[in-house]
Curated annotation (Swiss-Prot):
Mn(2+) 2 binds at K271, D276, D294, E355. Transmembrane segments: none annotated. GO terms for biological process: proteolysis. The keyword Cytoplasm applies. Its main location: cytoplasm. Its EC number is 3.4.11.1, 3.4.11.10. Mn(2+) 1 binds at D276, D353, E355. This is Probable cytosol aminopeptidase.
């Protein structure tokens, strides 16, 4: 998708296949809609009064308006004017792009980012517009025998109309949003691929492909022997249950900070269970197909690296991905087994379906060698987090208030929100074992919290936060598919650090 800017002069003379103008739920027209209304002898107001309610993201296409050069004027709902905010703007931009896709339009012009929003500057509005357009034009057909090429979106270019003095900031926001959209696209596609295609080896190959495409990226993909040499006994114990070879992926983005700093890199750690059957503690058959999404933490790390490399972000970032399958077999972990992690801590495995923390703990120990300024792990870790927060907010766990504030702010800014969960030391008692240093589960109460508490035992050498994306990484039902979250949150966090 190509994005560019144009000045607001002579809107009615812009020649385009589709021109988007905003309409509020109370019938009030945005400034751009008012211009088009006057040029068309009040045609817009007449239609709005008769049949358009202005719900956020709703669209109504008007063809061949008199006095207007655009082939189509698309009325886009903005919601109530008194409640218009960044989320309503994103819904409007996505609704417009979706309408263009449905009409098989190749290029379009939007005036929506020009509508001012309190505490949301034009750069942020432009960034959101590009992300929304990317979401509307995403199309998956990688595993269809005969892909319907006519179903692929034709929309290739959107021009944002803004005030002349805002063009530079708008263009920067569009550039950032486009990169984030590309990262989300990669994340979604990796998540949507089936487990027999998107294997640990496939994830490693994807990382290598990114490193070939972007000169700022370096990659190392470790195999079983190398992981054994590191002493990653916990990770190995999970991988042992499958014939599919494990991979431990180390990605580095060597940014060039404007100012020299002694601070270490930001490290992102992704859970890469490419299929999770639960192991010996077998999951129910219903919806087990969705356990291909158990690598969405890893996918989000790869998507984030794709975005930050495209932007050439002046920041040093390391990505770590522990990738394997969790299957039942004669070599798989058994309830009651005890394994030794890379940190030296022993773990009693009471439930083999709590495997994500078993691979992450060794990755968190590996992260120590980078002397990081902060570590954020991303994982579809617990169903308990879905029970607690549903599918709206990602669960955020940390005892570092400053890091929590930075991640929460990034979530609000990017509309990829998180909610901070408790991590009181008292929860650690649930992880006590009579036979090892720690048990891998703490019983039903506060399951997402005790999972985070388990990880915290392996992250004491640095500032650390855990994002549980079990409720936000994918959707079920008729719209089943990966969402690309939390790439926007992670990228906003990194943009704020740069």
């Amino acid at each position: 998708m190509e994005f560019s800017t144009q000045s607001t002069a002579s809107l009615h003379q812009i020649k385009t296949a589709a021109l988007a103008v905003g309409v509020y739920a109370d019938g009030e027209l945005s400034p751009a809609a008012d211009v088009i209304d006057r040029a068309s002898n009040n045609a817009v107001r007449q239609v709005v009064k008769a049949e358009f309610r202005g719900r956020p993201g709703a669209t109504l296409v008007l063809r061949a308006l008199p006095g207007v050069s655009a082939q189509r004027v698309v009325l886009v709902g903005l919601g109530k004017q008194s409640e218009y905010n960044a989320r309503a703007h994103a819904a409007a931009e996505q609704g417009f792009a979706a309408a263009c896709v449905a009409a098989r339009i190749t290029e379009a012009v939007s005036t929506l980012a020009a509508n001012s929003i309190a505490d949301t500057p034009i750069r942020a509005r432009a960034r959101s517009a590009a992300i929304a357009a990317g979401a509307a034009t995403y199309h998956y057909d990688a595993t269809f025998g005969k892909p319907d090429r006519d179903a692929r979106p034709k929309l290739k270019k959107i021009v944002q109309v803004v005030e002349r003095g805002e063009a530079a900031q708008t263009q920067q926001g569009l550039r950032e949003g486009s990169a984030i959209a590309h990262g989300m696209e990669l994340t979604r596609t990796l998540g949507n691929l089936p487990g027999n295609v998107c294997t640990p080896t496939y994830l490693g190959d994807t990382a290598r492909k990114l490193a070939r495409e972007f000169k700022s990226l370096k990659v190392e993909v470790l195999d079983r022997k190398q992981v054994e040499a590191l002493g990653m006994g916990s990770f190995l114990s999970v991988a042992r249950g499958s014939d599919e070879p494990l991979r431990f992926i180390v990605l580095r983005h060597a940014g060039k900070p404007a100012k020299k700093s002694k601070a270490g890199p930001v490290v992102l750690v992704g859970k890469g269970i490419t299929f999770d059957a639960g192991g010996i503690s077998l999951k129910p058959a219903a919806t087990m197909d969705e356990m291909k999404y158990d690598m969405c933490g890893a996918a989000s790390v790869l998507g984030t690296f794709r975005a930050l490399a495209e932007l050439e972000l002046p920041l040093d970032v390391v990505g770590l991905i522990a990738a394997c399958e969790n299957l039942p077999s004669g070599k798989a972990n058994k309830p009651g087994d005890i394994v030794t992690s890379m940190s030296g801590q022993t773990i009693e495995i009471l439930n083999t379906d709590a495997e994500g923390r078993l691979v992450l703990c060794d990755a968190l120990t590996y992260a120590e060698r980078f002397k990081p300024s902060a570590v954020v792990d991303i994982a579809t870790l617990t169903g308990a987090c879905v029970v607690a927060l549903g599918h709206v907010n990602t669960g955020l766990f940390t005892q570092d208030d400053a890091l929590a504030d930075a991640l929460l702010a990034a979530g609000r800014q990017s509309l990829d929100t998180a909610w901070r969960m408790p991590m009181d030391d008292a929860y650690q008692d649930q992880l006590k074992s009579n036979f090892a240093d720690v048990a891998n589960i703490g019983g039903p109460p506060a399951g997402s919290v005790t999972a985070a508490c388990f990880l915290s035992r392996f992250a004491k050498a640095y500032r650390w936060a855990h994002l549980d994306i079990a409720g936000t990484a994918w959707r079920s039902g008729k719209d089943k598919g990966a969402t690309g979250r939390p790439v926007p949150l992670l990228m906003q966090f990194l943009l704020d650090q740069a």
